């Protein structure tokens, strides 16, 4: 599956090859599987800036799905579809 990812206000610019937007292909269907694949590909920086100590997305990070829905409860279990757009935003 391929999703489009945008990072807003998080220091992952260098990690993602000096860009804030990437198309990312991964084997999975949930946000957890996406994050796991991102950590495998990009390393500790992704884990450091997106996840809390329990391995969940830090509640201070806002996750916007397809420009319309802010994910809140059980975010890691959110189902994704091919072509979805995700924005990870730092707290304001």
Regions found by a protein language model. Give the residues of each.
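Ubiquitin-like/PB1-type beta-grasp interaction modules and other compact soluble beta-rich domains
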Residues: 1-92
């Amino acid at each position: 599956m391929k999703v489009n990812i945008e990072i807003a206000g998080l220091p992952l610019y260098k990690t993602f090859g000096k860009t804030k937007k990437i198309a990312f292909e991964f084997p999975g269907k949930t946000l957890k599987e996406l994050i796991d694949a991102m950590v495998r590909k990009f390393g500790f920086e992704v884990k450091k800036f997106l996840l809390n100590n329990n391995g969940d997305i830090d509640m201070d990070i806002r996750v916007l799905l397809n420009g319309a829905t802010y994910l809140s409860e059980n975010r890691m279990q959110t189902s994704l579809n091919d072509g979805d757009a995700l924005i990870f935003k730092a707290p304001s």
